[in-house]
Amino acid sequence: MRIWVDADACPNVIKEILFRAAERVKTPLILVANQPLKTPPSQYIRSLQVAPGFDVADNHIVQNVEPGELVITADIPLAAEVIDKGAHALNPRGEFYSKENIRQRLMMRDFMETMRSSGEHTGGPAAFNHGDRMEFANQLDRFLAKTSKS
């Protein structure tokens, strides 16, 4: 089992949680980004810089993720693709995407995109906060505990 990270937009505090978790449970962590990333020295952690371009990092993750693996992303279309491949998707705020909720998230995303393109000011997501960080850490720990038992 590997953990993949859509790392370009992943908050640094989430990356730090992931670095510690990878070391603790001895699980490969792969950060995929269009730009160079700093990672701590570890046999379990590596960063992969892909070519610049729209969805290049996402496409690399989709092509390489295996069923049962975990992908950390806030990108809803990427989450939908990895779920279709049998992988798990967790966003940096600690919400797991699932077959049950991903279609609704995609429809809402598309609706908001349509509103913005028509000139409507929809605002963005709430600022990332301590509660989000804690929820992410808790969900990640539960997932890793569950997968280590199987």
Swiss-Prot record:
Q: Name one Pfam family in it.
A: DUF188
Q: Which InterPro entries match?
A: UPF0178
**NCBIfam families, from UniProt?**
PRK00124.1
Q: Write down the HAMAP family for this protein, in alphabetical order.
A: UPF0178
Similarity remark: Belongs to the UPF0178 family.
This chain belongs to the protein called UPF0178 protein HCH_06960
